[in-house]
Amino acid sequence: MTLDFNAVDPTVVPHFKGGAGEAHVRTAVADGMGRILTLTLPAGSSIGLHTHTGNCEIIHVLSGCGVCHDDGMDVPLTAGMTHYCPEGHTHGIDTTGDAPLVLLGILPDSK
């Protein structure tokens, strides 16, 4: 299967997971087995702290920069980096700088 995120209209989600600002989400796959999406956080926006229950999450940074709050540790994120949040763990992401932070998210269900 080939995914073209440019062919998917974004959904604007205010205060994503309780974060600041908004997220622009393009979900290409949501088939009951997991989800594959891109998420664009404009400058000043964030993904609020949340715990993964029933799935894990793999996030690859496509562009921009930010900081990941990973189980209480702050880890800088830049393009080309990948973050993994196992099931039962907590994370959140803030943008840093003036450019949007663009992420590829993969969330396989743990069922």
List the model feature ranges, each with a label:
Residues 54-66:
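Glycine- and acidic-residue-biased ligand/ion/polar-headgroup-sensing regions
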Residues 1-35, 48:
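A short, N-terminal "cap"/entry segment at the start of jelly-roll beta-barrel domains
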Residues 38, 58, 73-75:
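Short, surface-exposed secondary-structure edge patches
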Residues 46-47, 64-69:
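Short beta-strand segments in beta-sandwich/barrel cores
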